[in-house]
Design a protein with these regions (language model features):
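Intrinsically disordered/low-complexity terminal segments and short unstructured peptides
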Residues: 1-2, 61, 141, 171
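Alpha-helical substrate-recognition element adjacent to the catalytic core
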Residues: 2-94
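C-terminal cap/substrate-recognition subdomain and adjoining C-terminal extension
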Residues: 72-176
C-alpha cells in the first residue's frame, strides 16, 4: 500500500533558534543546524523518530515547503534523506498555501497514492476545515496534520502519524 507524505519544513520540523522552545524540544535535545540562509532549531529525537517511522512503513516523502530547493540541503543537515520537492513558484498574489495545495493536489492526482499524509503548520486546525482539502486530493484515505505555530511536531503528533501509517486497508475508517 503506498502512503505519500507531503511535508512542510518550517514550523513542522524546524523553527527559529530562539527560545521559547516547544515543550517537546527538551533542552538537551535541541540542535541548531545550518539552514543555508538562516540557522534553524530542531528536536533531534523527533526528527529521528519521524525518519524511523518513514523507513519502517515505506512512506514516500515529498517536500511541500517554501524552502523548495534548499530542502535537500536542510534535510541532510538534520539527518533526513534527500527527497523530491514540489515547485511552488507562482504569482505573488497567490498565497504560498494556495500554491502548496495546488502542487500537492497535482502530485497526488499524477501519482495516485492509496493514502496521503499531509503535515503543514498552515493547514486548517479543525477537521471541518480540513475535510474540503482532504476531499480535493481525491484519495480515499487522507490524514491532514497541522502542528501549532512554534510547536513543530510533537511526540503526540508522532503517535498519530504511526497510527495512520500502520493501519491496514481493512482497518482504515472511511472519510478520514
Amino acid at each position: 500500500m503506498t502512503t505519500q507524505l507531503y511535508l512542510d519544513i518550517d514550523g513542522v520540523l524546524v523553527m527559529e533558534p530562539t527560545p521559547p522552545y516547544p515543550p517537546d524540544f527538551r533542552a538537551l535535545d535541541v540542535r541548531v543546524a545550518d539552514g543555508r540562509f538562516v540557522p534553524v532549531a530542531y528536536s533531534e529525537t523527533i526528527v529521528t523518530a519521524l525518519a524511523e517511522v518513514i523507513a519502517e512503513h515505506s512512506v514516500n516523502i515529498t517536500v511541500a515547503s517554501s524552502w523548495q530547493s534548499d530542502a535537500p540541503y536542510l534535510f541532510r543537515e538534520i539527518g533526513l534523506p534527500e527527497v523530491e520537492w514540489l515547485d511552488l513558484s507562482g504569482p505573488a498574489e497567490v498565497s504560498m498555501f494556495e500554491r502548496k495545495h495546488t502542487a500537492v493536489r497535482a502530485h497526488a492526482l499524477q501519482h495516485r497514492p492509496q493514502r496521503i499524509l499531509w503535515i503543514d503548520d498552515h493547514l486548517p486546525k479543525t477537521q471541518v476545515e480540513c475535510d474540503p482539502l482532504a476531499t480535493s486530493l481525491e484519495c480515499a484515505d487522507t490524514f491532514l496534520l497541522s502542528p501549532s505555530l512554534r510547536e513543530c511536531l510533537t511526540a503526540e503528533h508522532l503517535e498519530s502519524i504511526v497510527d495512520f501509517v500502520a493501519l491496514s486497508r481493512a482497518e482504515t475508517p472511511a472519510g478520514r
